[in-house]
Amino acid sequence: MTEQLEARVEDVVQDIARDLDEEIYVLAPPKQNYLLLEVALSAAASLLLQAFVEGTKTVIADASADGIRVGFRRIMHSLRNRFAGALDEPNSMADDDANEARRNIASELWELRKHWTATQLESLTAKVQLDFQQALIGEGMSEGAAVSVATKLGAATTRLLAEADDTSV
C-alpha cells in the first residue's frame, strides 16, 4: 500500500464531509446526535466510507440476499457503535479514530484491487451502493439523503479503486 493512496483517501473523505447533509445526524445515537456538531464531519465521512468498503467485502463474502441483509445489518450496527464511541471521546481521539479509519480504507481498497478486475469492482460497487442506500433508509435516513450519501460513497469508492490500481504500477 502506498502513502499516495492514503493521501487520496483523505482527499476523498474531505470531499464527502463537505457534502454531508444534516440527515447524517440520524445515524448518531438519539441522546448524542447533537454532539455530531462537535465532531468533525470528516470523522463521520471516514466512518461512512469505511462502512461502504466493508459492505463491498460483505457482498464478496456472501452475495445471497440473506447474506447481504445480515451483513449490512451488522455494518450499520457497527457504524452506530463507532459514531457513539467517537461522540464519547474528546475531539482529538475522534480525529485519531478517523485517521485509523482512513488507513483501514486504504488498506482494504488495496487488497480488493489486488484480487478483482476494475470491471468486476465497478459492478460490485454499484450493487453495494443500492444495498447501502437501503441500509441507510432502514436506519432512519430520508430516501433523498440516503440516495445522495450512497451515490457519493459509491463514486468515491470507484475513484479510489481506480487510483489504487494506478499506484500499483
Which residues fall in each region the model found?
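Short hydrophobic alpha-helical membrane-entry/anchor segments
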Residues: 48-75
